[in-house]
């Protein structure tokens, strides 16, 4: 992604004083609904508990927690938006429950060395980690969360899949009866220097999605997030044009358990098949010479590395490399149509029958 932003930690928080950003997030219905259902659908987890909201923004998640019966909610917001959050809290008559602090969570202190039962945060960035604030949430977890405390969300998964990108390729072949291939080519060259945030239709995915990484937010460390790598041979599940790779994420929330019932798990998904969110999907476009027509069961070999930017640690650099499916090791059994995999699958099937 673009790394031209100065390595100024204050600039990150200042950007969140733009109310248009918060209008976008508050208008994101899947995002709002997931947090509301996860919190208000688990009132038994919040009733009488102490909650820490990291990066509280307008305070809406803190209000959900108060509505769910939390005894005390500490809403920490590093930007001047904290003043508006206080007004929103007052407007909803929760001043006795929600306390808003204008500071970074790294500078925050809970009174009397109190510990939080639950940490709530909407920290996710593009492809989960880019321009997000997970490091601050993990700091809060280690500093303030009780040993048996809960994280909302509590897990996160990054997926990757080969895809077609007709909006960047096919549409320029005939635009209102005019060939604009040269424009499309120039546009792709301009865009290929960094990943793009796009809406990808589910029918343009050539694979259902491979898990690049899964994070347990009670256990993962900031150091483990410095670099994440996937090296895979995926098998195309439908025919189509390989023009890029699509990245998205899911987050899950804890579900309460009791003798009477177990509340259903809430998932916030940015999968192309799910309702669109403001995160959309992240797409790495391939150079034109690397694009190819795929048949179902064709193998696609690649490696992708997400590396924390050295100058701005909230940003991540992506490095995609196409590999030779002939020489790369395939998962077993492999469903691709390469001869070696067909023979190996037949051999494994024979062994199972004999067994």
Map each language-model feature to its residues.
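Class I SAM-binding transferase module
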Residues: 1-54, 58-355
